[in-house]
UniProtKB/Swiss-Prot annotation:
Native species: Dictyostelium discoideum (Social amoeba)
This protein's name: Putative calcium up-regulated protein I
Family: Belongs to the cup family.
Domain Ricin B-type lectin stretches: 47-174
Segments passing through the bilayer: none
The keyword Heme is assigned to this record: no
Gene3D superfamilies reported for this sequence: 2.80.10.50
Key word Cytoplasm present: no
Keywords linked to the UniProt accession: Lectin
């Protein structure tokens, strides 16, 4: 509250107290309790003043108190394992105006060998978002299997390159020094070209190299991962008790506690959301000195508690801002999901299966926010991602977020999603409790709330919430559509040079059609799973394109899309498989139709690949084996597939068995029957996720 309001409230409290107890002085704690009538009166006056001064904040706090309470007696967190997430690589050396610059790919080109450069944090620039793979590759969001490397022509320029297993592409982030170290040359790290002797001031377009700086304190070779998720460290730090008060200070502490809330320990009220810490602050400011305590001792305790009240209220406001964001986005009782299902021509109450991943929903939403609001988006990420990390590891069912992919009927989809949304909010409340009950955590968090910018900032102002919601909605809607659309639609591939005399439908809407820019003979279109004559509405496709999805990632199932791919030709007896790699690790798969008919395909990071081959020996039913490997040729998964061929009907594809290595999740395969009447093959999509 403002100083003016504090003074006004203090005066009102003093006047009210004098009217009620004009002759009473502070002697013993049991003699200073105000009547319930007076407490209610003062509370009402404070509330009225508070509403006039901070109407939006007061409204938010009232809502908080009415819908939730904080848990207590939580066990300490020993560790938090961060999940894979998209981040900025932000150089600690600022430009001449004190603005941060991030590592990106020059021109946003996807050609191997493109220079990595520094550039101001830019909206909607996927080349500035990176993900660290399990083995240390720095994977770009710009394209699958597009990773950071360096040029071995003697220039040592940092480049974006195609994935390989050379150590030049393996990096380690040293959190102690802030250096991104290269595994190929010891003691070398990513930095600004020409700055190994001493720091220089970078500009947009400054080239990056790997080099060995003379001074490890050189900011040109130091980086922050943004968001940095500082709450992971704070919440796992050793417990630190609040300062103790000896002798008369403890007497003063009890005196104040009794006066404010009729308890012996006012700190027990920090997690009680039904009380107002600003009200306590103003009450405490108005207290007269007890006659039996020195002013110095009393002021010492009052000053310490005043600091604690301020720090605690900052944390409550931070979590309250997240809660407002969360409720606006997720607590709509399935309204947004129902609207999108209607756009997809799906009945949300039907028993049609939907498949997806809650982690993918959160991830898609988060990188949408980072792209749209690179300045303030990381503040939300610093809160949300830690809560997700805690939820995935939680053993308490109420707080557990489901990490593995799910398959549910559409009628149960909202229940599945909302259970995880509630678990996310529960973990945020748990975080709030832990921060409010530990002095060390409270002090550190206060410092980050006061830090207005930077990778560790938690300075979430209430005015930011609307922008964060607006930035989150596109990513959230796309994530929901990635779950819904494969239940109704698949991608069809038409090859003009190899079509078996089957023609391309002539009524495909332009919004549902895409020609491969690298091969004009290849056309992709989206249509109903059962017929090539039913297409998504233009309103649905406009929503997808309007939310920034590229045609290439949509029609080739990249960045969270997991469509089946059917081949449009007269070979209707085949069952075309698509492998969707939803991980930051490069994969490949082998498909074996027979001992002599074996094919191998790469599956880039966050991308899909498929085969146009089929069993050329099959007359009736056929079987094939799919084996998936990682980039080191280690086994990841195996799937046995059966293709049943029916006269005058399309091939029916099914999975006989499957298995998966530790560290990965195999999603439920989506199996679709082909069509004799419409001349398309059976199809299957097999999604794979990281554990």
């Amino acid at each position: 509250m403002s100083n003016k309001l504090n003074k006004q409230i203090s005066t009102e409290i003093s006047e009210c107290y004098l009217k009620e107890k004009p002759q009473q002085s502070f002697k013993k704690s049991n003699e200073i309790k105000m009547s319930n009538e007076l407490i209610n009166k003062i509370s009402n006056e404070i509330s009225n003043c508070y509403l006039k001064e901070k109407p939006q904040q007061a409204k938010k706090e009232t809502k908080k108190k009415s819908i939730r309470s904080l848990p207590t007696d939580l066990p300490p967190l020993k560790s938090i394992t961060p999940l894979k997430s998209w981040i900025f690589l932000q150089c600690r050396q600022m430009d001449a105006n004190g603005n941060p610059l991030c590592c990106g790919v020059s021109g946003r080109y996807t050609q191997p060998g493109t220079q990595c450069i520094l550039w101001q944090i830019d909206e909607n620039d996927p080349s500035q978002l990176w993900q660290i793979s399990k083995d240390g590759h720095l994977v770009s969001l710009l394209a699958g299997n597009y990773v950071m490397d360096y040029n071995n022509d003697g220039t040592n320029l940092a480049i974006a390159n195609g994935w390989n297993n050379y150590t030049s592409q393996i990096w380690t982030y040293n959190s102690s020094t802030g250096q991104i170290e290269n595994s190929n040359y010891p003691n070398t790290c990513l930095g600004i070209k020409g700055a190994f002797n001493e720091p220089i001031t970078p500009t947009n377009g400054t080239e990056l190299v790997i080099d060995q700086p003379i001074d490890n304190n050189n900011l040109c070779f130091q980086w922050d991962l943004v968001p940095s998720y500082p709450l992971n460290t704070i919440l796992t730090s050793p417990p630190q008790a609040f300062p103790t008060f000896p002798g008369d200070q403890n007497t003063a502490f009890i005196e104040i506690s009794q006066y404010l809330s009729n308890v012996d320990d006012i700190r027990s009220q920090y997690t009680n959301l039904s009380v107002s810490l600003p009200f306590f602050q103003s009450q405490m400011s108005a207290m007269s000195y007890p006659s039996y305590l020195s002013h110095e001792e009393f002021d010492f305790v009052r000053d310490q508690l005043s600091t604690e009240f301020n720090y605690a209220q900052e944390i409550i406001n931070l979590i309250g801002n997240y809660e407002s964001f969360h409720n606006e986005l997720f607590a709509d009782n399935s309204a947004r999901l129902n609207q999108l299902a209607t756009l997809c021509q799906l009945e949300i109450g039907s028993d049609i299966n939907a498949m997806g991943s809650v982690i993918q929903v959160f991830s898609g939403m988060m990188y949408s926010i980072l792209e749209a609001l690179p300045g303030v988006g990381p503040i939300l990420g610093n809160v949300l991602q830690t809560a997700v990390n805690i939820g995935v590891a939680a053993s308490d069912g109420h707080s557990t977020i489901q990490p593995d992919p799910f398959q549910v009927a559409l009628s149960n989809l909202w229940d599945t999603l909302s259970t995880n949304y509630e678990a996310l909010l529960s973990n945020v409340s748990n975080m709030e409790t832990m921060l409010l009950q530990d002095w060390g955590m409270m002090v550190t968090t206060h410092g980050l709330i006061e830090t207005l910018s930077g990778p560790n900032s938690l300075a979430w102002q209430s005015s930011m919430t609307g922008d964060l919601i607006s930035a989150a909605v596109p990513g959230y809607e796309i994530s929901l559509l990635q779950i819904l659309m494969p239940s109704k639609y698949q991608i069809y591939r038409y090859d003009l040079a190899n079509n078996g005399n089957v023609g391309l439908p002539d009524d495909i809407p332009s919004s549902c059609l895409w020609t491969d820019p690298n091969d004009s003979n290849i056309t992709y279109f989206i249509a109903d799973n059962e017929t090539t004559k039913v297409y998504p509405d233009d309103s649905l496709m406009s929503l997808i394109w309007g939310n920034g999805v590229s045609e290439q990632e949509f029609f080739l199932s990249a960045n969270g899309w997991n469509f089946c791919m059917s081949l449009l030709n007269d070979n209707i007896g085949s069952g075309a498989p698509t492998i969707s790699n939803n991980t930051s690790t490069a994969l490949n798969f082998k498909i074996q139709f027979s001992p002599t008919q074996i094919y191998n395909y790469d599956v880039p990071t966050h991308s899909s690949n498929f085969t146009t081959e089929f069993d050329n020996t099959a007359i009736e039913n056929s079987y094939y084996q799919i084996t998936i490997y990682d980039n080191t040729n280690s086994w990841v998964a195996s799937i046995s597939v059966r293709v049943d061929i029916f006269v005058m009907r399309g091939a029916d594809v099914s999975v006989l068995s499957s298995s998966c290595a530790d560290g990965y999740y195999l999603g439920t395969p989506n199996c679709l029957q082909g069509s004799f009447a419409h001349s398309f093959t059976g199809s299957i999509n097999i999604p794979i996720f990281e554990n």
